[in-house]
């Protein structure tokens, strides 16, 4: 209950405060390339319910339906998208998802269905027992995930075999130990990581 009130408060006032920035970003995206302002993609949320996540579009619109993994300096990424991705600004519209109850500020990142299928059953059920988050400890530790995957001959296999198990460990650690102070710590560490890259 406290966590949900925390999410509601910060997502509501965050969206109000960030509205001018959102307008500027929307204009930049539209001027930079053809297509929509937002990128919507199906993700698996609380109790396995599918929802469409909100992100600022960072790739050519013709590539949107193909996106599962983005590796290194992907040629599909727009000029505005490079900046938005570097500072994780493309994730800010997920405050909408937090406000409507599909996500939380902090929690396991929501995956696409094909990667959820790779989760061991006992792990999957536990991870899907909480709302997915905009940020978490795995996102902080693996902030350069795309660059790491670029080094592998088969990035998709590397993601499933190497990256996912690491993420799952951090997801479970969070679920087993989460409290409001841990959420505040993760939010602080997220900003610190973004602005010291």
Language-model segments: which ranges?
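Intrinsically disordered, low-complexity boundary segments flanking structured domains
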Residues: 23-27, 41-42, 116, 123-129, ...
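Short, glycine-rich, amphipathic interfacial segments at transmembrane boundaries or analogous
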Residues: 39-76, 110, 138-166
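Positions in alpha-helical segments
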Residues: 11, 39, 78-82, 114, ...
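A short, structured surface patch at a secondary-structure boundary
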Residues: 72-132, 136
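A hydrophobic, helix-centered structural microdomain
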Residues: 1-61, 174-197
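Residue-level recognition of specific faces of alpha-helices
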Residues: 27, 40, 55, 76-79, ...
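C-terminal terminal-structure detector
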Residues: 128-197
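Conserved catalytic core of Hanks-type protein kinase domains
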Residues: 30-31, 86, 98, 143
């Amino acid at each position: 209950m406290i966590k949900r009130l925390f999410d509601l408060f910060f997502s509501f006032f965050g969206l109000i405060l960030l509205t001018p920035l959102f307008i500027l970003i929307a204009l930049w995206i539209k001027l930079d390339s053809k297509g929509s302002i937002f990128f919507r993609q199906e993700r698996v949320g609380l109790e396995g319910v599918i929802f469409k996540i909100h992100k600022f579009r960072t790739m050519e619109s013709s590539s949107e339906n193909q996106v599962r993994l983005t590796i290194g300096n992907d040629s599909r990424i727009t000029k505005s998208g490079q900046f938005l991705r570097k500072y994780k600004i493309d994730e800010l519209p997920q405050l909408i998802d937090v406000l409507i109850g599909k996500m939380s500020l902090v929690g396991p990142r929501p995956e696409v269905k094909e990667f959820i299928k790779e989760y061991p059953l006992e792990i999957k059920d536990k991870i899907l027992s909480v709302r997915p988050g905009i940020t978490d400890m795995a996102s902080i530790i693996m902030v350069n995930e795309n660059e790491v995957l670029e080094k592998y001959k088969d990035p998709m296999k590397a993601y499933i075999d190497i990256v996912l198990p690491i993420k799952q460990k951090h997801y479970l650690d969070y679920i087993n130990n989460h409290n409001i102070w841990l959420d505040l710590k993760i939010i602080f560490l997220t900003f610190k990581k973004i602005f010291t890259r």
